[in-house]
Amino acid sequence: MNINKHLILLFSVLFFLFAVSVSSGCFRKNESDVKSVVRNELDQLKNLDSETTQKYIPYTELFPDATENTDLTDEINKTFSLFFRKFNYKISDVIVGTANHSATVSVKLTTIDSKVLARDFKAELLRTQITESAQAQKGSIKDSSRSLEAHYLILNHLLNTNDYDTAETDCNIQLVNTGNNKKEKWKIQRTNSLEDDLVGGLIADLADPDILSPEDTLTVYLDTLQKLDLKEMTSYLGVVNIMNTSDTAKNSIASALAEQIHKNFNYVIKSSSENGYNATVTTEITTFDSDSILADYQEKLDKYLASADAVIDGSQKRYEKSFEILLNSINDNTVTTVNDVDFVLINDGVSWKLQDEGNTLGNAIFGTLTNSPLETSDSEDENISADTDKQTDDNTSTESSSN
């Protein structure tokens, strides 16, 4: 009897160990299957497989704010290839649910530093929009920077010209078993969180309205302004509209003023403050001294108008002379002025934007030259013309009386 009891106990233990062994083997097999599925998908991303990339990160999802969609082009595929060229991963843990219906794989992903890339992208996009705005105002180009294609061209340019550092992201990949008891079939669940993790948080960073601070945003405005050519600058700042003269005169004076900006403009951001969706950035602006230009112009104009030549020249020549004096005063100016300017920016939920950008920058740079000094000289010229006409009438009356 004792022998039978011992045998039964022994067989029970052996059966239990066998069952545990089989269960453990199945569990390890499930873990291996899950890991294999994840590894296969991530390897395809690592090997720059376009189809896998679009399966997890649809190209339209990266820039949901783009106004004009486009088909998936080779250029867009190249952009994703550039982004994933430093992609790598390391599986750290696999957890399979007790019923084998779900699994979670913990992965450490290595991608390009998305925060730096997103900041560069937003700055380049704003720079492009400012330039296109200047070009559009002079009628040479339409605003196309908001299209999906333009967004990818900017991203492609940044990835081609910059060597970005890498960053690591901890990611949990969820899988579900879509098979049956006889044959398991593990499938990765595609989620917004996974989509963003695979690009290192780039989608969230691009959507961050504060990715560029108010100071960073103003820096883009001012740096871009310095690089605009004469026509773009005068168009963007509305300099042409400052001068109430003929087109030729407008262009000449506007070009002279823009050249003064190129030679003298500089800035130093001193401080900033935020209040909700509003920010004020105090900036030290160095620019040409408009008061000095106007003083020189007025002095030379007064001297000319007091001369006999002004009476003899007639109204048209007086106008041409006053224009010549103003142009020379601008071209000959070497005096600069330094002033603190408070720039107001507003966050519209997408990014920080300079309020009334063209006029704000124009007033900060041109100062008292925001109004045309030629308007004053035109009034003075009318007075001279009236005095001349009166003198002519008086002379005519005197001659008639003598006769």
Language model feature labels by segment:
Residues V116, A123-A207, K303-K317, N333-N383:
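Short beta-strand edge/turn micro-motifs at domain boundaries
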Residues Y56-F63, T166-C171, S235-K250, K317-I325, ...:
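Short glycine-rich, low-complexity/disordered patches
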Residues E51-T52, I112-S114, L230-K231, F288-D289, ...:
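Primarily extracytoplasmic ectodomains and periplasmic/lumenal surface modules that are beta-strand-rich
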Residues I3-K29:
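Sec-dependent N-terminal signal peptides of Gram-positive bacterial secreted proteins and lipoproteins
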Residues V38, Y89-I91, A103-V107, I173-L175, ...:
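Hydrophobic beta-strand residues in large extracellular and virion-surface proteins
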Residues R28-L82, K86, L198-K270, S292:
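Core segments of small alpha/beta cavity-forming domains
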Residues D74-L158, I253-S329, I384-Q391, E399-N403:
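Surface-exposed, charged secondary-structure patches
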